[in-house]
Amino acid sequence: MADHVQSLAQLENLCKQLYETTDTTTRLQAEKALVEFTNSPDCLSKCQLLLERGSSSYSQLLAATCLTKLVSRTNNPLPLEQRIDIRNYVLNYLATRPKLATFVTQALIQLYARITKLGWFDCQKDDYVFRNAITDVTRFLQDSVEYCIIGVTILSQLTNEINQADTTHPLTKHRKIASSFRDSSLFDIFTLSCNLLKQASGKNLNLNDESQHGLLMQLLKLTHNCLNFDFIGTSTDESSDDLCTVQIPTSWRSAFLDSSTLQLFFDLYHSIPPSFSPLVLSCLVQIASVRRSLFNNAERAKFLSHLVDGVKRILENPQSLSDPNNYHEFCRLLARLKSNYQLGELVKVENYPDVIRLIANFTVTSLQHWEFAPNSVHYLLSLWQRLAASVPYVKATEPHMLETYTPEVTKAYITSRLESVHIILRDGLEDPLEDTGLVQQQLDQLSTIGRCEYEKTCALLVQLFDQSAQSYQELLQSASASPMDIAVQEGRLTWLVYIIGAVIGGRVSFASTDEQDAMDGELVCRVLQLMNLTDSRLAQAGNEKLELAMLSFFEQFRKIYIGDQVQKSSKLYRRLSEVLGLNDETMVLSVFIGKVITNLKYWGRCEPITSKTLQLLNDLSIGYSSVRKLVKLSAVQFMLNNHTSEHFSFLGINNQSNLTDMRCRTTFYTALGRLLMVDLGEDEDQYEQFMLPLTAAFEAVAQMFSTNSFNEQEAKRTLVGLVRDLRGIAFAFNAKTSFMMLFEWIYPSYMPILQRAIELWYHDPACTTPVLKLMAELVHNRSQRLQFDVSSPNGILLFRETSKMITMYGNRILTLGEVPKDQVYALKLKGISICFSMLKAALSGSYVNFGVFRLYGDDALENALQTFIKLLLSIPHSDLLDYPKLSQSYYSLLEVLTQDHMNFIASLEPHVIMYILSSISEGLTALDTMVCTGCCSCLDHIVTYLFKQLSRSTKKRTTPLNRESDCFLHIMQQHPAMIQQMLSTVLNIIIFEDCRNQWSMSRPLLGLILLNEKYFSDLRNSIVNSQPPEKQQAMHLCFENLMEGIERNLLTKNRDRFTQNLSAFRREVNDSMKNSTYGVNSNDMMS
């Protein structure tokens, strides 16, 4: 007993040190000791002691969090009886101690929610013992307000817990629990919550009473959690708020057909303090987003009418909207009016004319206060964008009145942005133009809004542009002009150029007229005239933001008016010809290229302008007709003949910039490569002339490497710039003739330099990443460009170089030792990922016969594959799925290996095979469909190989199985659980999940079943028996039909038959289970 007291005192002291000390060392020591305590065998009993006798809130918190970890662990889980005891203990503890610290209560409720979720399918005497949440909290709800708050918080936390997937348990298990909870309990909890809210609002809550305050807050959180539930398992991305539909089950219809539910929340909004209103509005946002199919047309019209009435009432009494959170949620609510309902439905609402006027006034006022809640404005612009986009399609006879109000919104946006410039400069405020992502998002929305009543938009833009341009010109000519006045006009012109680009980009071919194209011409002329003015001043001064706006304008103009699809008779070109003498597309392209060269000349040290300029050049080089017109321009010929740092400063080796700043060089050379290819043909002299600067760079690096002491920084910069240039050229050369010129130029002369760079600087990803990416591009058989003559050994020689680079990099990168977690991707995994991509490209390129390597004793293939295994084993499983690029490169490589090199896989050590199979097993449930599909393909190849080897081993043959196949069979027979687990996982996904790649899932399933017939039979019986008695026969029949006509082989005809059967099986199972709230009580199915 004394020991218990002593250890209790020690634990309490450690808790105090963990949560209260300011000394980092003491805290870390306490944390380490408490981690050991959590993992100790007597943790459970000590936690109970802490809760019973602990004198501090921190020790109670420790006990609750430790117990939560204990009940959550997947290996060695607690017995059912023990978990039931903990659940009951927690409920009693909460019921007898209402004055606990808030964070302790929260931690205990979290413990209750976790036990309930993970035990959802646990039975005791045919009773689901963890499904009595409402009964569990009834005693709390019938007591004082303090207890009522605890009861409501329990339900709220439980709903939230069940809605959230966690990484330690399979997604299939999570969805099964969530679906069962949705069908059996969620509506009852929602109804209870609404009833309690009605009671609370009917009692004239005394909001000065803090406990009643807390109760209302918890009730609103509970209601919001119910409405925010992921009803059908599709809300994987919580960051997106667009087009969000709440998939309310049909069984909830009654609650939404009853107008009092909607009215309750609007009444609450007006009767409670503004600090509570955001949650009320969040609930209304979800209610407004219920799926359309929940109602018939008449019901939807009635529901929408109530919703619009409620919105109108808020707009008529806008006092609470001065609170930023209220304002934000209300903007979201307005956006849902159009994302979920059609304009034709809105105009039929009785109060539509008043409401659209109020919404327009509210929007105009919001836009005029540009400094207030810019993130909320997104939702208002989203509403008007969708309204404007619907105008051509609306068939209702009632007037939509958008021709009156949309121009007001457009004008408010444009004028408010211009008026903001002076205030921002005067007061030194943050400039919205710095946030290019937000500006671009708003401009995309304005592009649609501004095209509605386009004549008014253009007239406004022309008027404002002419005013600002004239003032700007006068200021530039004045000797006494202040820099502030010039900056204001440049800021206003920056906004106008962005907006002009946006409205031109909003042109829709089927809805635009000659008059509108002529208006576009007016706007384009003005921007090009402004460009001539600003370009003429670049030697003295330039404005970065205005230049970025110009590039945005050019990009929009290119998309709409340049290219193969554009009608050359467009009125826009007529206007350009009249004003600027630009008679056709070729002359306009000349202006584009002139701007590109000017920017690269004057802004070569400004990365944002350089990269956007080069992106524009790259986009121009893609079009079939435009690239041919470009090549004829003297400016383009100048670029092809003078791509050196003397003419383009960004190609220089600037010691001040980072190596990563050279990325834009790849874009530049991709464009140049495309332009060169137009007329290159087989002209090797022209090619060599073009490559002279790169040849000189390679020779310079070779010269440096040949000496014992050289300037490492200069060598790195020269090499990194060079390989980035080459990667651009290699990417552009997608025809056999041109690519062979590049290959013969780089191999064998310069390949040793790349290998030497990897050898020297393997630890520096700024050097290795570009080199590895170049090699990965060179071995990529894009557009069948790597086709060597039958007498050429080049395919094998290229693979030898690939193997050499992978082996050299792989062996050296593994010597790095322990890498900090936050740097592991940059320093190690990124390079490994590129190596995997490189090896995959080489193995699947169809230009090497890999059988000859072993035949002639060449170890290139073996070295590359063994290095792959060494690199793979250095990566924890979790990292394979945590880093998307690594996932995709690994699983696509594994797919090629299992398809074409199964003998190699079969020859691996047992622990390596198990590692690979585990990675496939985990990848089957990945959220990335590409990864999941790749895993299915890998598994199919492995299972097919196994089945064939097994079939051969049972037949009497003169040639015995080779050693690898024999060992592989033996390993699989020794460890059947892994393959069985994957059978269970695949079947689980097909039955219980929204399976997006059903065909891919079906391919390995037949092999898995044939290899594990007894296990499949047990699994099937388990699923059938878990159904309600009246559904068991139907489920049994589903499984019978699945195997109907299926033979014991994996021939294509048999596989196709199985895939067809599986589609029917999935449909029948889903129909059978629709009304069932029962689940599969099978550990195999759930694990």
Swiss-Prot record:
<dbReference type="GO" id="GO:0005634">
    <property type="term" value="C:nucleus"/>
</dbReference>
<comment type="subunit">
    <text>Binds to nucleoporins. Found in a complex with XPO7, EIF4A1, ARHGAP1, VPS26A, VPS29, VPS35 and SFN. Interacts with ARHGAP1 and SFN. Interacts with Ran and cargo proteins in a GTP-dependent manner.</text>
</comment>
<keyword id="KW-0813">Transport</keyword>
<dbReference type="InterPro" id="IPR044189">
    <property type="entry name" value="XPO4/7-like"/>
</dbReference>
<dbReference type="GO" id="GO:0005049">
    <property type="term" value="F:nuclear export signal receptor activity"/>
</dbReference>
<dbReference type="GO" id="GO:0005737">
    <property type="term" value="C:cytoplasm"/>
</dbReference>
<keyword id="KW-0539">Nucleus</keyword>
<feature type="domain" description="Importin N-terminal">
    <location>
        <begin position="30"/>
        <end position="96"/>
    </location>
</feature>
<comment type="similarity">
    <text>Belongs to the exportin family.</text>
</comment>
<dbReference type="GO" id="GO:0031267">
    <property type="term" value="F:small GTPase binding"/>
</dbReference>
<keyword id="KW-0597">Phosphoprotein</keyword>
<protein>
    <recommendedName>
        <fullName>Exportin-7</fullName>
    </recommendedName>
</protein>
<dbReference type="GO" id="GO:0006886">
    <property type="term" value="P:intracellular protein transport"/>
</dbReference>
<feature type="modified residue" description="Phosphoserine">
    <location>
        <position position="570"/>
    </location>
</feature>
<feature type="modified residue" description="N-acetylalanine">
    <location>
        <position position="2"/>
    </location>
</feature>
<dbReference type="Pfam" id="PF03810">
    <property type="entry name" value="IBN_N"/>
</dbReference>
<comment type="function">
    <text>Mediates the nuclear export of proteins (cargos) with broad substrate specificity. In the nucleus binds cooperatively to its cargo and to the GTPase Ran in its active GTP-bound form. Docking of this trimeric complex to the nuclear pore complex (NPC) is mediated through binding to nucleoporins. Upon transit of a nuclear export complex into the cytoplasm, disassembling of the complex and hydrolysis of Ran-GTP to Ran-GDP (induced by RANBP1 and RANGAP1, respectively) cause release of the cargo from the export receptor.</text>
</comment>
<keyword id="KW-0963">Cytoplasm</keyword>
<keyword id="KW-0653">Protein transport</keyword>
<dbReference type="InterPro" id="IPR001494">
    <property type="entry name" value="Importin-beta_N"/>
</dbReference>
<keyword id="KW-0007">Acetylation</keyword>
<dbReference type="InterPro" id="IPR016024">
    <property type="entry name" value="ARM-type_fold"/>
</dbReference>
<dbReference type="GO" id="GO:0006913">
    <property type="term" value="P:nucleocytoplasmic transport"/>
</dbReference>
<dbReference type="InterPro" id="IPR011989">
    <property type="entry name" value="ARM-like"/>
</dbReference>
